[in-house]
From Swiss-Prot:
Species: Mesorhizobium japonicum (strain LMG 29417 / CECT 9101 / MAFF 303099)
Keyword Membrane: no
Family statement drawn from the similarity comment of this UniProt entry: Belongs to the UreD family.
Statement: the UniProt record of this protein carries the keyword Lipoprotein: no
Pfam families: UreD (PF01774)
Reported function: Required for maturation of urease via the functional incorporation of the urease nickel metallocenter.
Keyword set, alphabetical order: Chaperone, Cytoplasm, Nickel insertion
Name listed for the protein in its UniProt record: Urease accessory protein UreD
Localization terms from the record: Cytoplasm
Molecular function (Gene Ontology), one example: nickel cation binding
Gene: ureD
GO terms under cellular component: cytoplasm
InterPro entries from the UniProt entry: UreD (IPR002669)
Subunit annotation: UreD, UreF and UreG form a complex that acts as a GTP-hydrolysis-dependent molecular chaperone, activating the urease apoprotein by helping to assemble the nickel containing metallocenter of UreC. The UreE protein probably delivers the nickel.
Length: 280
């Protein structure tokens, strides 16, 4: 009797999202114009039909969210005396990870006397998500930057809370080759327990960090503190020939957080004001 041999098959690997998008702009004839646009995978960039100054760009993750093993990269290069305002089409969602972690890497480069506003909408972290984000900013002499990252751990209105998981956020900001700001935020695996600590967030689920590198930083400190209120704080330092204003905010949910982020971004983003997609 013939022997039947069985071949063992490994389970199919889950499909992972991967993408890289690069945007370059330069100043020409007194206006900021697109110089380079590259898109690969699920990372897309869209520009309004009517170009504005500063140049406006919208980032889109066509995968619809992130989960374990996904990799997304955003690279923005703003030339000398050019200006750009970057936001996202919607809130980025980080879903439960079966294995590995989702990673987002952001690189922002600004030439002399250029300006960038990095203003993505909130990142929503779901239960048992695993997420790591790195943000590297290189500023030339005289360059300005407004950088915001806001995170909401769960959606209370939907009865969802991110109780377990890991979240890592690493920032490095340099100007004229010198490190002027660095931070490493890590939370997990007990997210609820960590956020409940009085020295951490006091039980809230929505947090934001906003950094302004500009000679205007010191003059804006008092109005920033008025908007931030008692749920957060703001400080200012002199760095190189510029200034650095750092504000941190926390709130009971994403809606309450945005109620203060909207006027804060409008104040700090100069004539560009609030990104249009924030008000849709």
């Amino acid at each position: 009797m013939d022997t039947i041999e069985y071949t063992e098959f490994s389970p199919p690997l889950a499909q992972r999202a991967a993408g890289l998008a690069q945007l370059g702009c330069a100043s020409a004839d007194g206006r900021t114009r697109l110089r380079r646009l590259y898109q690969d995978g699920s990372a897309k960039i869209r520009l309004p039909a009517v170009l504005a100054d500063p140049l406006e760009a919208v980032l889109i993750n066509t995968a619809g969210g992130l989960t374990g093993g996904d990799r997304i990269g955003w690279d923005v290069d703003v030339g000398t005396e050019a200006s750009a305002s970057i936001t996202t089409q919607a809130c980025e969602k980080v879903y439960r990870a079966a294995s590995d972690q989702a990673e987002v890497r952001v690189k922002l480069t600004v030439g002399e006397n250029g300006r960038i506003a990095w203003l993505p909408q909130e990142t929503i972290v779901f239960d048992r998500a695993a997420f790591a984000r790195t943000l590297d900013v290189e500023l030339a002499a005289g360059a300005e930057a407004l950088v915001l990252e806001a995170t909401v751990f769960g959606r209370l209105a939907m009865g969802e809370r991110a109780s377990q998981g890991t979240f890592r956020d690493r920032w490095r900001v340099r100007q004229d080759g010198f490190l002027i700001h660095a931070e490493d935020f890590r939370i997990g695996p007990d997210i609820t327990g960590a956020l409940a600590r009085p020295a951490a967030a006091g039980g809230v689920i929505a947090v934001a960090t906003l950094l302004l590198v500009s000679p205007r930083a010191e003059a804006l400190l008092d109005p920033v503190r008025e908007i931030v209120g008692h749920q957060g704080g703001a400080s200012v330092w002199s760095v190189k020939a510029s200034g650095k204003l750092l504000a941190r905010l926390y709130a009971g949910d994403g809606y309450q957080l945005r109620q203060r982020l909207v006027p804060l971004v409008g104040l700090l983003n100069g004539r560009a004001g609030l990104p249009k997609l924030w008000s849709l």
